């Protein structure tokens, strides 16, 4: 399972959606990246492969970061979820 994490301006919690296939995850990552680069204040709608009923709509100019990661290893893969990990 591949996860696309999105950080939003002024919001401490991020938004995540999952894709089963690497190519699908890369396509969504590139779509979000292109939307950010366009600078247009449009809405980006996303769905989640892991939770088919999960839908999200985001105002593109509020996105501050996007990350694509392989979560097939689960939480025990030795690293924290999200963008940053503080050393112990």
Swiss-Prot record:
InterPro entries xrefs: UPF0367
Family: Belongs to the UPF0367 family.
Protein name per the record: UPF0367 protein AM1_1885
């Amino acid at each position: 399972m591949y996860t696309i994490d999105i950080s939003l301006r002024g919001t401490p919690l991020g938004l995540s959606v999952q894709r089963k296939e690497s190519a699908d995850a890369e396509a969504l990552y590139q779509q979000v990246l292109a939307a950010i680069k366009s600078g247009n204040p449009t809405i980006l709608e996303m769905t989640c492969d892991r939770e088919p009923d999960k839908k999200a709509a985001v105002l593109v100019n509020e996105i501050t970061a996007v990350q694509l990661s392989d979560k097939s290893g689960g939480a025990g893969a030795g690293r924290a979820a999200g963008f940053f990990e503080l050393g112990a």
